[in-house]
């Protein structure tokens, strides 16, 4: 009713020897021939979330990895802070940028919503900030962990 394959995967670990895992993949349903590339792609897609989850935080993050910023281009932290006006090129005067509530045009009393905290998302630890770049880099986690070593038909497979 389906196809079964034996998959051998090598998992590279930093500072330790690579680990080799062998497991059985069974596709249920149609027994029509499928392309090997499509099946390999499916297994890689299944392995990807586990690779990312097992990566964990980096002990010594490099520049641009853990602080919510990129090495070049605009920082996502600037995009989160819509109300925090930066730079001398802004048309509002300095007093409006540094008002009591942290928002423009709210000087004197507390501003609605955020209070004196300013942009609430920019406060606290960089790793605790929301967004795609908080914590570890997904790009590094995807490309550096596992390699598909062997892909073969399961020897005990029977056609129905």
UniProtKB/Swiss-Prot annotation:
One Pfam short name: P19Arf_N
A single BP term in Gene Ontology: positive regulation of apoptotic process involved in mammary gland involution
Gene3D superfamilies on file: 6.10.250.60
Tissue: Widely expressed with very low levels in kidney and colon.
Protein known as: Tumor suppressor ARF
Top-level taxon: Eukaryota
One Gene Ontology CC term in the entry: nucleus
Location within or outside the cell: Nucleus, Nucleolus; Nucleus, Nucleoplasm
Keyword annotations of the record: Apoptosis, Cell cycle, DNA-binding, Nucleus, rRNA processing, Transcription, Transcription regulation, Tumor suppressor, Ubl conjugation, Ubl conjugation pathway
Keyword Lipid biosynthesis: no
Subunit composition and interactions: Does not interact with cyclins, CDK1, CDK2, CDK4, CDK5 or CDK6. Binds to BCL6, E2F1, HUWE1, MDM2, MYC, NPM1/B23, TOP1/TOPOI and UBE2I/UBC9. Interacts with TBRG1 and COMMD1. Interacts with CDKN2AIP and E4F1. Interacts with CDK5RAP3 and MDM2; form a ternary complex involved in regulation of p53/TP53. Interacts with NOP53; the interaction is direct and promotes ARF nucleoplasmic relocalization and ubiquitin-mediated proteasomal degradation. Interacts with TTF1 (via the N-terminal region (NRD) and a C-terminal region); the interaction is direct and inhibits the nucleolar localization of TTF1.
Species whose genome carries this gene: Rattus norvegicus
GO molecular function: cyclin-dependent protein serine/threonine kinase inhibitor activity; disordered domain specific binding; DNA binding; DNA-binding transcription factor binding; MDM2/MDM4 family protein binding; NF-kappaB binding; protein kinase binding; RNA polymerase II-specific DNA-binding transcription factor binding
Keyword Glycoprotein: no
Post-translational modification: Ubiquitinated in normal cells by TRIP12 via the ubiquitin fusion degradation (UFD) pathway, a process that mediates ubiquitination at the N-terminus, regardless of the absence of lysine residues. Ubiquitination leads to its proteasomal degradation. In cancer cells, however, TRIP12 is located in a different cell compartment, preventing ubiquitination and degradation.
Location of region: Interaction with CDK5RAP3 and MDM2: 1-63
Main location: nucleus
Region (Disordered): 49-74, 90-116
InterPro entries xref list: Tumor_suppres_ARF
């Amino acid at each position: 009713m389906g196809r079964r394959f034996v998959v051998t995967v090598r998992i590279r670990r930093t500072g330790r020897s690579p680990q080799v895992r062998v497991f059985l993949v069974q596709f249920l349903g149609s027994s029509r021939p499928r392309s090997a590339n499509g099946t390999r792609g499916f297994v890689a897609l299944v392995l990807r979330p586990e690779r990312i989850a097992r990566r964990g935080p980096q002990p010594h993050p490099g520049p641009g990895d853990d602080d919510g910023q990129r090495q070049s281009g605009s920082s996502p932290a600037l995009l989160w802070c819509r109300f925090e006006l930066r730079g001398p090129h802004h048309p509002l005067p300095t007093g409006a940028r540094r008002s009591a509530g942290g928002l423009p045009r709210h000087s004197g009393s507390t501003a609605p919503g955020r209070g004196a905290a300013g942009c609430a998302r920019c406060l606290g630890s960089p790793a605790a900030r929301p967004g795609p770049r908080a914590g570890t880099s997904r790009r590094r986690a995807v490309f550096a962990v596992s390699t598909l070593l062997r892909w073969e038909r399961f020897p005990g497979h029977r056609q129905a």
